[in-house]
Amino acid sequence: MGKIKVTNDCNGIKGLKVIEPAVFGDARGYFMETYNYNDFKEAGIDCEFVQDNQSASKKGVLRGLHFQINYPQDKLVRVVSGEVFDVAVDLRSDSKTYGKWFGVVLSAENKKQFFVPKNFAHGFIVLSDYAEFCYKVTDFYHPNDEGGILWNLSLIHISEPTRH
């Protein structure tokens, strides 16, 4: 139905993508496709999502930075209520951007989505009073396969989002 607008290789990091869906609004409200295999494949996101997850968090809650060791996952994330600052850190040891990060504000209002490929650490902090966060993944959850990185690790230097 609707095409998506894609920003590729965010902050020069290969594979990271910010997706802006086509939103069709009228006096009744709006409609948008949150995922369309053909549109995403055309945008270079050709993977099989096997699980959808949703979390709810209060203001200031920090989730992440998490990564999977033996069962890495591509992730497609979005916010359905509230606002978060979402961050991905490149953990690909052979990458020119190893250790580099990119962050984007995702909200119910801007409707942006963020594609995070395998072998990245990922996390978010809730900026609004409350947020509901949805994400698709390409592998099932393996509880003994998760690692983590501290947000304030001096080697990464993650900074807060700027407000205009």
Q: PLM features: what roles do these ranges have?
A:
Residues 135-138:
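Short, structured patches in soluble enzyme cores that scaffold and shape functional sites
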